[in-house]
Each structure stands twice: as C-alpha cells, then as structure tokens.
C-alpha cells in the first residue's frame, strides 16, 4: 500500500490499508468462519456487578464495523466496547490521520481520526437490533460530548433505545480532546460528578469512566474519588497517549494534525501506573493501553485490574486473543 502511495506521490497513509484488511478479513470470515471460531476456556469468567464476562479480554472502543467486531468476539473476546458516539454527525479529521509507528522496536499506531460517527440518533437505531447481542456478552456503549448536557442527552436516548436489552454498560469517555473547546469532563470533577449522579437517577446500568494517561496524577485521583462516590461504576484506565508527529517519528506531510494518540506496547508502562493508582482508591478497573501478551495481562492483574482492554493488538495480531485466553 505504501509503495503505491509513493508511486502516486501521495502522503503515506495507513488508513486505506486498514480498510482493505478489514474488508478481506470480513470476506474470509464468511468463506471460512472456522478459522476464527475459538472456544473460551471455562473458569476464566469475570463478574462485575450483574455483568458476566466469559473472558476478561475486551475490545477497546475504536471500531464500529459489526462484521469486524463479530470476528473478534468469535475469537474469544469477553466483551466489546463500541466506538465513542456523540450527538451529531462527525466526519473526523482530514486524512492522513492514521500511521504505523515504531517505538523502541515495537509496533504501534499514531491516531488522530477524530471520532467520526453517524450521530446518536442513527447509532441508536443501528444498535437496537445489532447481531452483536447474539453473542451474549456485555457490550460497552461509549459516549462522548462537548458538555455535561450532551452526555446526559445521549445517555437518555441510549437507555430508551435499549430498554429491551440488559447486557450492556455505559462508558463515559472523558479522555478524548475531540471537543469543540478542547476540554473534557476530566477538567471539571464537579461537572463529572453531576453527570454521574444524574445518570444514576436515570438508570442502574453499570457505568464506566474512561480516563486519559495524559492527565496528571492529582487529576486522576480526583476523578477516582468522584467515580467511587457513584454506585455500580468502574474505571477504564486508559486511552491513547498524545505525542506530536516529531515525537512519534512521523513526517509532517504524512499526518494532517500536529499530533495524535499513540497506542501499542509503548504506552503500557504509563497505563500500569494508572492501574496502580486506581487500585489504591479501591475501584474496579479495566486496564486499556498496550496490552498484547499474557505477560501484560499478568502485570495489570497483579496491580488490581479485572478486565483487560485491547485495541492495537487486535489489528496487528487478532490471534493473540485465543492465545492469551488459553494461558489465563
């Protein structure tokens, strides 16, 4: 793919390669589904409140294509969190906005996609009858917003649309700066507390709060205290870690934004520190950031995490899922 981009004098762009791979993966899953069907070993189930995860491995919130998510569930993920949805239609940032990087000899991805999505109204219509429910595993509905009011409006619509479903949790994504003013609920603990408490008045669904590794420890600690004050909640620690194109080793002509979020093994140490912090507060934790091996899983488990979110690893080698499951 990069060869043809260079041949045509176009900027290097990973996104067409990912889309091409997704289409062929989906086609292969229809032709030979047995390739992707793996049993989840017994006795690795995790219970979180009233949710049962047959495997503690979960798909992080970065995909919305049902056929790809279904493949990962067939391979043994215990849950999937859908890509963050916002109130209105979003086209995302200009391309190129996705690049492969090499950090300390390990593959990763630099991403500034910008939360493209159809908007909450179309999303709720699609998710109501999605075939993903047929797997019987908890689905995470990730919610973004430019204000506390937008979060609450989106939550209300989701609760109404999914009134006949009970195997899901809500995730408040307060870790992504793709907002109109660049601020998130992480910048205002009082507003976060208001959103959580008003959400709890609307529903008893489990609520996750997804935090950023770019936040300072005092901020994370404050968020942890706020989340802990609301019943039936857990922390998702965390998300991608911001790097400029220079820091990530990407040429400026090959990226439309000044920087983006790095994912992959390079961000694992920071995520591990976050897990330790929230474990000391006493919160249930989903660890997300750089997990790709059984050693990673054991490390975050030892620090107190009970669920393990995966993203880049699913793109680079989805067969790591059954491999890790077999060693849990």
Model-derived segments and their meaning:
Residues 66-72, 154-157, 215-229, 280-281, ...:
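Catalytic cores of alpha/beta
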Residues 26-38, 174-187, 220-283, 321-326:
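Glycine/Thr-rich beta-alpha phosphate-binding loop at enzyme active sites
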Residues 1-37, 262-286, 292-328:
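Alpha/beta catalytic cores of nucleotide-metabolism and tRNA/nucleoside-modifying enzymes
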Residues 90-107, 244-260, 301, 312-328:
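C-terminal helical cap(s) of enzyme catalytic domains, especially alpha/beta-barrels
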Residues 103, 108, 117-136, 189-209, ...:
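Alpha-helix-loop-beta-strand connector modules within alpha/beta enzyme cores
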Residues 102, 106-171, 176-183:
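Active-site beta->alpha loop and helix N-cap motifs at the rims of alpha/beta catalytic domains
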Residues 76, 81-88, 169, 174-176, ...:
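Glycine-rich phosphate-binding active-site loops on the catalytic face of alpha/beta enzymes
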Residues 1-136, 324:
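N-terminal capping/small domains of soluble enzymes
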């Amino acid at each position: 793919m990069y060869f043809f981009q260079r041949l045509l004098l176009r900027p290097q762009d990973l996104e067409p390669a990912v889309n091409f791979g997704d289409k062929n993966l989906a086609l292969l899953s229809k032709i030979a589904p047995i390739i992707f069907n793996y049993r989840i070993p017994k006795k690795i189930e995790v219970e979180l409140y009233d949710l049962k995860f047959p495997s503690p491995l979960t798909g992080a919130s970065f995909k919305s294509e049902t056929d790809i998510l279904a493949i990962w569930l067939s391979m043994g993920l215990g849950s999937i969190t859908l890509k963050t949805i916002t109130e209105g239609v979003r086209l995302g940032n200009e391309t190129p906005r996705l690049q492969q990087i090499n950090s300390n000899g390990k593959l990763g991805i630099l991403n500034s996609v910008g939360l493209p999505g159809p908007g909450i109204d179309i999303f709720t219509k699609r998710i109501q009858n999605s075939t993903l429910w047929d797997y019987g595993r908890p689905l995470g509905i990730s919610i973004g917003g430019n204000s506390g009011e937008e979060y609450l409006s989106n939550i209300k619509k989701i609760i109404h649309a999914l009134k006949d479903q009970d195997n899901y949790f809500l995730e408040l994504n307060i870790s992504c700066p793709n907002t109109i003013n660049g601020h998130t609920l992480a910048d205002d603990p009082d507003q976060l507390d208001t959103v959580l408490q008003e959400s709890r008045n609307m529903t008893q669904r489990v609520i996750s709060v997804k935090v950023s590794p770019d936040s300072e420890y005092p901020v994370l600690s404050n968020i942890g205290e706020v989340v802990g004050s609301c019943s039936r909640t857990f922390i998702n620690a965390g998300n991608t870690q911001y790097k400029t194109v220079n820091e990530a080793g990407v040429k400026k002509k090959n990226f439309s934004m000044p920087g983006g979020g790095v994912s992959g093994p390079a961000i694992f140490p920071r995520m591990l520190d976050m897990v330790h912090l929230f474990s000391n507060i006493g919160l249930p934790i989903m660890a997300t950031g750089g997990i790709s091996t059984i050693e990673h899983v054991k490390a975050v488990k030892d620090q107190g995490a009970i669920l393990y979110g995966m993203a880049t690893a699913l793109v680079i080698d989805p067969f790591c899922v059954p491999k890790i499951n077999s060693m849990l």
